[in-house]
């Protein structure tokens, strides 16, 4: 299929063999990438941090023709971590090929892109403008690594191609991703004597009823027709409460997830949650609920006529689209880039047992990234 395929396959084989599940260190992969990039003339800067469990994580910013603190012409951005895999998938860390597909955990999300980015960077010569390769940690558990880069001002570029499995379709906009945990309190008692307690589950039901009403009305007033659906969505995917069938529940907890359209403050739903709480307290002074906002990651909407959008559309042959899942593009935008999400594979097979990337996607992606390097950095 291509002279580049054997080398791409070899690199991807090495990348997937390193278990970079988010709860593990990603240091081996960073060491591997840094060694190869430095051997090709890149200068590398590492940003170390500990995750909530005290596990060491590392972001890598490698530049050819500049420094990590400066602004590159183009950044190729990929996250090094993967979601966990089922123990029954015994070949999860061994790249296997069948019917034109390369199978392994991370092959699609996003080590396939990293392999392509590394090869496009390693083969770049005579650069006239700085090229940057950015590898982040802990994207799968809150975009933590990308947020650390923003805090430190590392990874600045004029244009950024953020790796995700988009089927080689340029994605110029994505919704944000936000989470809040709500705990509603009641009073335990014997279920045979309702007046002896106050049901936290019934109280939570009243809270959720109001939330659903707002999700179906107020949050559908702001529209962005570039998305499907074109409004901010709300979901309550987890709820827990009660101890036994004959005990009035004293507590009920649920998790609210919302995906704001770009331009809408990500805090809007958390403000609505607080409004609901206050209204319920007004109606029932004994009502008690605590709201803990966990994440408020905004979306991004890169201009349709931005140079990087137009280039990727032409180079890939695919019209730009939008997606409703979160990416690291907003963080790259905060660092000053016009960012587009792009990469081999399909998000619908990511995070699954039997995750794969099509061989053809891998080869085409590397070719597009190589063209991007030549276009934005003037190399060959």
Curated annotation (Swiss-Prot):
The keyword Zinc applies. It is an enzyme of class 3 (hydrolase). GO terms for cellular component: cytoplasm. Keywords: Amino-acid biosynthesis, Arginine biosynthesis, Cobalt, Cytoplasm, Hydrolase, Metal-binding, Zinc. It holds the Pfam family Peptidase_M20. Zn(2+) 2 binds at residues 109, 140, 351. It is found in: Cytoplasm. The keyword DNA-binding does not apply. InterPro entries: AcOrn-deacetyl (IPR010169), ArgE/DapE_CS (IPR001261), Bact_exopeptidase_dim_dom (IPR036264), Peptidase_M20 (IPR002933), Peptidase_M20_dimer (IPR011650), Peptidase_M20A (IPR050072). Pathway: Amino-acid biosynthesis; L-arginine biosynthesis; L-ornithine from N(2)-acetyl-L-ornithine (linear): step 1/1. Homodimer. Belongs to the peptidase M20A family. ArgE subfamily. Catalyzes the hydrolysis of the amide bond of N(2)-acetylated L-amino acids. Cleaves the acetyl group from N-acetyl-L-ornithine to form L-ornithine, an intermediate in L-arginine biosynthesis pathway, and a branchpoint in the synthesis of polyamines. This is Acetylornithine deacetylase. It comes from Myxococcus xanthus. The gene is argE.
């Amino acid at each position: 299929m291509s002279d580049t395929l054997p080398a791409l396959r070899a690199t991807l084989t090495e990348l997937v063999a390193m278990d970079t599940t988010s709860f593990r260190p990603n240091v081996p992969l960073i060491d591997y990438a840094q060694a190869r990039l430095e051997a090709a003339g890149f200068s590398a800067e590492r940003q170390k941090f500990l995750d909530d469990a005290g596990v060491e994580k590392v972001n890598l910013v490698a530049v050819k023709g500049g420094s990590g603190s400066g602004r590159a012409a183009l950044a190729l951005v990929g996250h090094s971590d993967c979601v966990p895999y089922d123990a029954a998938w015994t070949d999860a860390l061994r790249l296997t090929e069948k019917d034109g597909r390369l199978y392994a955990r991370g092959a699609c999300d996003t080590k396939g892109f990293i392999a392509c980015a590394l090869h496009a960077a390693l083969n770049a010569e005579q650069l006239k403008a700085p090229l940057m390769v950015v590898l982040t940690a802990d994207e799968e558990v809150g975009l933590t690594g990308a947020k650390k880069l923003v805090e430190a001002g590392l990874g600045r570029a004029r244009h950024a191609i953020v790796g995700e499995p988009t089927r080689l379709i340029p994605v110029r906009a994505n919704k944000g991703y936000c989470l809040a945990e709500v705990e509603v309190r009641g009073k335990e008692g014997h279920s045979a004597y309702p007046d002896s307690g106050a049901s936290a589950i019934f109280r939570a039901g009243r809270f959720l009823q109001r939330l659903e009403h707002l999700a179906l009305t107020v949050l559908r007033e702001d529209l962005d027709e570039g998305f499907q659906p074109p409004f901010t969505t709300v979901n309550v995917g987890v709820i827990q409460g009660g101890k036994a069938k004959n005990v009035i529940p004293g507590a009920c907890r649920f998790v609210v997830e919302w995906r704001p359209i770009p331009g809408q403050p990500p805090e809007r739903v958390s403000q609505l949650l607080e409004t609901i709480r206050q209204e319920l307290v007004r109606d029932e002074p004994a009502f008690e609920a605590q709201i803990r906002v966990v994440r408020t990651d905004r979306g991004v909407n890169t201009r349709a006529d931005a140079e990087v959008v137009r280039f990727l559309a032409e180079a890939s042959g695919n019209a730009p689209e939008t997606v409703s899942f979160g990416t690291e593009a907003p963080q790259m935008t905060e660092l000053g880039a016009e960012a587009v999400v792009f990469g081999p594979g399909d998000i619908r097979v990511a995070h699954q047992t039997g995750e794969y990337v099509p061989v053809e996607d891998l080869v085409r992606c590397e070719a597009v990234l190589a063209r991007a390097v030549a276009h934005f950095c003037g190399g060959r």
